[in-house]
Amino acid sequence: LDVFRYQAIHNVIYAQFLDLLRVDPATVSFPTDIPHMPIGLFKKYRLKSGEWEPVRTFTSSGTTGIATSHHLLSNEEWYRENARCAFELQYGTLQDRPVLALLPAYLERTGSSLVFMAEDFIQRSGHPESGFFLEDLPTLSQKLAALKSGPVPPLLIGVSFALLDLAEQHAQPLGNTVIMETGGMKGRRREMTRPELHGVLSEAFEVDHIHSEYGMTELLSQAYAPKNGRFLPAPTLCARVRDITDPLSAVATGNT
């Protein structure tokens, strides 16, 4: 509630949004009553609370001619620490863990928060085999084969279509490797349900579980699903579902 009231005062666009909804911040007594800001506002405005110059701007992916979301960052180190905390809460320390990132669609553009996070994880790991892999699947496959039986389970984090490419071209048992998909076919393949995707990857790499990461430009926190698609949010993330046409109305469980 303190954060809400701060933003209601210092975020000009959010203050206008509350005014249009005729919501008096002083009357909001419970977190469940906080009005949610539509994602569309991140596309139309540069949102920030207070007066400061951004040190970095995260942008969402999008096709030519389509407006993308922008999220301004005032402190890069805060984002790094927050992302590390969310990951390490579920998986333990990044230090000495091999981190192999397969994020071709994201590496090909600027402003990706996922690439920024993965870059920090790679540096934080301090492992000589950690790094990004754009399209060099043979080298990635060789590294995974060498690391799969190591003392620390390696992390393979990748966009869905690229992991499917790896599964088709270089299927192999990956032992205790943490294989983590970040979603996204990016128009490269047909869309698949998460259970279908995980089934294909589990069979190709002979692992019991495929892990999932969820994040978005408009959020500065992540959620992770170690198994069964059940996402566990970071301490700084509280998810609530609202009606797409009414930011004050909650959506009942089981509805969309």
Region spans (language model):
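Active-site glycine/GP-rich loop and adjacent strand/helix microenvironment
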Residues: 1-6, 10-13, 96-98, 105, ...
